[in-house]
């Protein structure tokens, strides 16, 4: 049977320092400051301000401008077309350009140019 007041005394072999040293007490720590809600609110406010600054910088910042430049270029690289390589190039004469314009296939600046090169129009994007 179990008695409520009876607790056996620990042996000296198990706890030999029981009577020699007093138990240490933890130093009193000041209570911690809440659940961190003010810090979380400050972090969220910083990110919101950063997002607003980014939106304003993109909206009012430098804009991209597009321009066109006519550059003299070689014909495009040879590509196989249904297994046939296009290797014979010739410049269109004024009569060829006139025929294509009547058929609705006229390409601007497709006539002969300086040094036998055909000019092409390339877009340039800059700040």
From Swiss-Prot:
Superkingdom as given in the UniProt entry: Eukaryota
Keyword Membrane attributed: yes
Alphabetical keyword list: Glycoprotein, Membrane, Transmembrane, Transmembrane helix
Subcellular location: Membrane
Glycan attachment positions: 15
Intrachain S-S bonds: none
GO cellular component labels: membrane
Bilayer-spanning residue ranges: 38-58
Entry membrane topology: Single-pass membrane protein
InterPro entries attached to this UniProt entry: SMIM33
PANTHER family registered for this protein in UniProt: SMALL INTEGRAL MEMBRANE PROTEIN 33
Protein name in UniProt: Small integral membrane protein 33
Lineage: Eukaryota, Metazoa, Chordata, Craniata, Vertebrata
Gene name linked to the record: Smim33
